Amino acid sequence: MPTNIYVTEEELKKQEKIMKEIAEENKGKNLYYHIETYGCQMNVHDSEKLAGMLEKMGYKYTENLEQADVLLFNTCAVREHAEIRVLGRVSQMKELKARNPNLIIGVSGCMMQEKNVVEAIKEKYSYIDIVFGTHNIYKFPQLLWEALNSQDIVIDIIEDTKNVIEELPVKRDSNLKAWVNIIYGCNNFCTYCIVPYTRGREKSRKPEDIIAEVKELAQKGYKEITLLGQNVNSYGKDLDEDITFAKLLYKLNDIEGIERIRFMTSHPKDISDELIYAMRDLDKVCEHLHLPVQAGSNKILKKMNRKYTKEHYLEIIDKVRSNIPDIAITTDIIVGFPGETEEDFLETLDLVERVRFDAAYTFIYSKRAGTVAANMPDQVDDAVKHERLERLIELQNKISLEKSAELRGKIVEVLIEGISKRDSNKLTSRTRTNKVVHFVGDESLIGKLANVKITETKAWTMQGELVEVIR
């Protein structure tokens, strides 16, 4: 596997040329693609880039796998369960390939950065045509061209790139809300996490490139952006200029047309007063902070290499809430980390009780090959993990329900996102605190900001009545 490479302008022009050649070859043909995405929002945005390139090469999107001429699986390696799901899904494609030998099947993403997975693909999935990772999406046109002109599997994996690749075509899933990468990779090396190995070291985009992208989105009518990074708080540390994440937020807040700014994910050790004050003072930055705590025991946090304590985390929460009283705070929590005792788990429950998160994404610890935690002693029994997860979910569901109930009877600002999937007579909208509200309204309101009165509440979704359209 090649190490870090610098992607030149000439290389990107080569890919552009190949895209044009494939598009010319595909003229007049009804060719289709389908992409299945697993994992985080970074993967979702990567899939949008792959879709953008495929559309530029003359392919149209289809939900029907039988109709597809190119089928891509963009994979996630964070948890073993996700890998099992992906490989199970890929194995189902053998019959489809037998019925349609000209179908190009590609597997990409974080799983492909693992050598053992690539070897398994070569040995057990001979009908796969293309294998590539997270760092060379820009090279997809060439890989597709090679697969179209060869009977051999095309494998292209690199460890990392030294530079950020800009200006790839993007086909976004929404014409209202957009993902915007600001930093790639991670330098934190939490002992349970494979991301630094699959996504590489931190690389920040230049602020002028981010600003240009957001201005273009505003001109196209996008109302909300979500800034993405494994740790957005690290933004700018690797750049030779005076820029921080908070300073970037100030620049983006000034862009006309954008109504809302969100971001994820933040690392507690890097939350600064500057960022808290920016969230408080900037009118477009939404009152929602996703701040993964992972555990409530200092012993476990140290074993995880999280670089903060329970007490430090609680201090951050107090400071955030004292400056932004109505903020919604969500988190990630892992149960069953190696060495976690009942006492350690009770510390986590205590933290959940004290913080009262609006929601928590809860996970059972999953051993990932190549991480420090995979070789730790005192692995927790599966039955104990599941029992602890159930207790944690029960507590958090109760808190989420109580937090949502606090909004009953109140009027809140929402961005109207579309028609409800469950009731075509209703619209789906989202509060600044990232809670979903359904209410009766005309589809002409989609894309508007409105005030809605909350009438019914569940843990994370609500019913409301339209009060007024803001703009």
UniProtKB/Swiss-Prot annotation:
Which keywords belong to this entry? 4Fe-4S, Cytoplasm, Iron, Iron-sulfur, Metal-binding, S-adenosyl-L-methionine, Transferase, tRNA processing
The cross-references to SMART domains, in alphabetical order and at most eight, read: Elp3
Can you say what this protein is called? tRNA-2-methylthio-N(6)-dimethylallyladenosine synthase
Residues engaged in binding [4Fe-4S] cluster 2:
C186, C190, C193
Residues recorded as binding [4Fe-4S] cluster 1, renumbered to this chain, are C40, C76, C110
Q: Which domain of life is it from?
A: Bacteria
Q: Which InterPro entries match?
A: Elp3/MiaA/NifB-like_rSAM, Methylthiotransferase, Methylthiotransferase_CS, Methylthiotransferase_N, Methylthiotransferase_N_sf, MiaB_methiolase, rSAM, rSAM_horseshoe
In this record, what's one Pfam family? Radical_SAM
CDD domains referenced in this protein's UniProt entry, alphabetically: Radical_SAM
